[in-house]
């Protein structure tokens, strides 16, 4: 919202007479903005073409002014568990995940986090384990667009090992680093993938694919997610542990670490498409509050309409379609 002073969207792209369209606006301006309805005849901005032609439609919606207010939004896709996972450690805690990083960043990129524990890629491109504010990193940077398995094991006495293995080179050995980090015996909390969540706000988004996250406590698997399941939805059912909810529509059924180009249809070999691709700029719904509504009058002709908002030199248009009334006779 740094560069756009006046911006809006509608909750639906089409409506029939009698139905309601809600409009959600963000304005950084101090003055009120004005909303007016137009019927679009031509939306061609080419000066050599017909041009933009609009008809006044104020008899269906009276031109009205509304107070300006800024509404924030947070792009970036991630997953978060529907419920907290109970983690009570007596001996050790292990977490493993397969990743395919696609973009380097000056910011940390969170891969998986729970409670005060996080695996992430730091600004130098190193896979890192963090507990509270202390961290240990692998000394060799990750290669972009390559599959890696990352595994972290922490014992109750604070001994930590973090390892990574690049999967495309079978003869290349696993790289490991060790250190000392103290973790809480009770590490219960919500699990997040591809972002870290603080006070309900996500940040440090991961760019790339994630596959097969797994949490083990005292050699017993308590969290295990098959990301190839239920791919038509925004819910990931668990094998063990709480369900994951996907935010801002990451891409599902994408090629995973087992994909060998033998099958191009993810439905035929779902295990070859067992990854989810997350992006820091994914967006689905800004979840803004409604500023005003239009209940489409019964006599409104079908066609393309635009709700235009304006404040001084700033303006925006929100197009939508008015469809004919169902079961009403139409001209032949």
Stretches found by the model and what they are:
Residues 1, 7, 186-189, 223, ...:
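Low-complexity, Pro/Ser/Thr- and charge-rich linker/hinge segments at domain boundaries
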Residues 33, 284-329:
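Extended acidic/polar, glycine-enriched regions
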Residues 34-35, 40-73, 177-187, 203, ...:
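Extracytoplasmic low-complexity segments
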Residues 76-130, 217-222:
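Extracellular glycan-recognition modules
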Residues 93-105, 150-152, 193, 210-215, ...:
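Short hydrophobic/aromatic patches on beta-strands that form ligand-binding or substrate-lining surfaces
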Residues 95-97, 145-164:
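Short tryptophan-centered beta-strand motifs in secreted/extracellular beta-sheet-rich domains
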Residues 124-128, 171-210:
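Flexible glycan-contacting loops in extracellular carbohydrate-active proteins
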Residues 129-149:
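Short, aromatic/His-centered strand-loop micro-motif at the edge of beta-sheets
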């Amino acid at each position: 919202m740094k560069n756009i002073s006046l911006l809006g969207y509608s909750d639906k792209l089409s409506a029939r007479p009698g139905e309601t369209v809600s409009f959600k606006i963000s304005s950084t301006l101090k003055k009120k903005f004005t909303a007016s309805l137009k019927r679009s005849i031509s939306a061609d901005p080419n000066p050599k073409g017909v041009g933009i032609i609009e008809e006044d439609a104020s008899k269906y919606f009276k031109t009205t002014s509304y107070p300006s207010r800024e509404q924030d939004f947070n792009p970036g896709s991630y997953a978060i568990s529907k419920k907290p996972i109970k983690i009570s450690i007596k001996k050790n805690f292990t977490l493993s995940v397969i990743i395919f990083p696609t973009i380097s960043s000056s910011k940390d990129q969170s891969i998986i986090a729970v409670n005060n524990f996080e695996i992430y890629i730091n600004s130098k491109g190193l896979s890192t384990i963090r507990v509270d504010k202390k961290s240990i990193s692998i000394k060799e940077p990750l290669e972009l667009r390559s599959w890696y398995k990352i595994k972290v094991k922490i014992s109750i006495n604070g001994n930590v090992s973090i390892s990574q293995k690049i999967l495309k080179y079978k003869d290349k050995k696993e790289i490991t680093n060790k250190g000392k980090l103290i973790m809480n015996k009770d590490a219960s909390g919500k699990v997040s993938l591809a972002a870290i969540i603080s006070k309900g706000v996500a940040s440090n988004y991961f760019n790339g694919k994630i596959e097969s996250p797994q949490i083990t406590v005292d050699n017993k698997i308590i969290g295990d997610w098959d990301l190839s399941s239920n791919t038509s939805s925004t819910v990931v059912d668990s094998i063990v542990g709480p369900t994951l909810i996907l935010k801002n529509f990451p891409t599902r059924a994408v090629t995973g670490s087992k994909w060998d180009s033998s099958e191009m249809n993810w439905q035929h070999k779902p295990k070859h498409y067992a990854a989810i691709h997350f992006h820091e700029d994914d967006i689905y719904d800004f979840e803004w509050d409604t500023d005003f509504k239009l209940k489409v009058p019964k006599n409104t002709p079908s066609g393309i309409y635009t709700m235009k908002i304006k404040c001084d030199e700033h303006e925006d248009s929100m197009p939508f379609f008015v469809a004919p009334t169902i079961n009403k006779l139409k001209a032949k």
